[in-house]
């Protein structure tokens, strides 16, 4: 069985990590204090971190309220992005794609491009301090109107290759099925903007199939296809990456127990997978924790490490030069 020392020190790639769900208690406390709002560390720990027996997805999502208030200024955005990349680098994450919804950071008048550039500045600062490469995924939100989402994507497209590596669709799958967003992703496809889509987190395999039909190169979560061999084969044949987030899926009841987690099914089906935190603070987790959770469940073995690393790299949205750099970080090549 792989031990924690190996899991912590081996090179890793993380492709599914939300900025607002990964702000530390300490940074959130500081940024709120700068706004004149005082909280104790204990109060913030309770407000930001969801319990393992989280009663509902709604309860999980309310943990994002305070962090989002901190992401309304350039300074807050820079600080959150830099901190996240440094935390990831500390546990040997060599490539990190950070996702967030720029449209949620406009409350104090920042433009979409200013918001994205601020996050990129924080990430690039971290890159000068640690051995890590980063990219930004901008999230369109299912609950926002078409005009808001499309306008954000158009602004973000101007920064593709200048920090931005692709886009995503996040939010309530049940209330806003992926089929409602064909126009958005047709625009992204025509404008050569790579995309992943949160799909199959809340029980809908149809959303996964729709995402693939629209041209998604990766699927966020993908749990709902665990009982659909045909869909698993489609993902494997098309080399569609699946972004696994075990702890988060347990908390939001996407699966009832770790014993039901489909890692082994997906692995044996030949689906390219990455192992991710989703939200480091909300789920109180790290990449190391995620690997160990699957290891302790008897699913992940040390012999799989290189295959997962290379599959994650292949399905990342990094450009070729970055991929070559990250490829070279695997010690056995």
What spans do the regions from the language model cover?
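Metal-cofactor-binding active-site regions of metalloenzymes
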Residues: 1-193, 203-207, 213, 217-218, ...
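Conserved hydrophobic beta-strand within the GNAT/NAT acetyltransferase core sheet
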Residues: 195-197
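Acidic/histidine-rich helix-loop elements
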Residues: 200
């Amino acid at each position: 069985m792989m031990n924690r020392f190996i899991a912590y020190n081996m090179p890793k790639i993380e492709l599914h990590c939300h900025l607002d769900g990964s702000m530390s208690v300490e940074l959130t406390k500081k940024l709120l204090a700068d706004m004149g709002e005082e909280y104790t560390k204990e109060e913030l720990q309770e407000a930001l971190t969801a319990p393992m027996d989280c009663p509902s997805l709604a309860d999980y999502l309310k943990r994002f309220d305070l962090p989002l208030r901190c992401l309304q200024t350039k300074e807050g955005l820079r600080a959150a992005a830099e901190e996240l990349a440094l935390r990831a680098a500390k546990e040997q994450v060599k490539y990190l794609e950070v996702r967030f919804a720029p449209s949620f950071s406009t409350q104090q008048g920042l433009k979409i491009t200013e918001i994205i550039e601020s996050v990129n500045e924080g990430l690039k600062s971290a890159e000068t301090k640690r051995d890590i490469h980063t990219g930004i995924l901008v999230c369109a939100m299912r609950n926002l109107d078409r005009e808001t989402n499309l306008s954000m994507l158009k602004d973000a497209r101007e920064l593709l290759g200048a920090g931005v590596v692709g886009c995503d669709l996040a939010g309530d799958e049940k209330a806003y099925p992926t089929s409602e967003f064909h126009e958005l992703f047709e625009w992204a496809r025509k404008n050569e903007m790579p995309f992943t889509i949160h799909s199959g987190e809340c029980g809908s395999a149809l959303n996964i199939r729709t995402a693939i039909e629209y041209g998604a190169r990766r699927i966020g979560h993908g749990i709902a296809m665990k009982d659909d061999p045909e869909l698993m084969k489609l993902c494997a044949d098309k080399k569609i990456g699946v972004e696994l987030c075990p702890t988060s899926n347990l908390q939001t009841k996407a699966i009832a127990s770790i014993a039901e987690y489909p890692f082994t099914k997906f692995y044996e089906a030949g689906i390219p997978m990455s192992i991710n935190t989703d939200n480091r603070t909300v789920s109180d987790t790290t990449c190391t924790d995620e690997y160990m959770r699957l290891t302790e469940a008897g699913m992940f073995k040390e012999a799989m490490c290189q295959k997962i690393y290379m599959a994650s790299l292949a399905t990342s949205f990094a450009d070729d030069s970055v991929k070559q750099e990250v490829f070279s970080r695997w010690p056995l090549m």
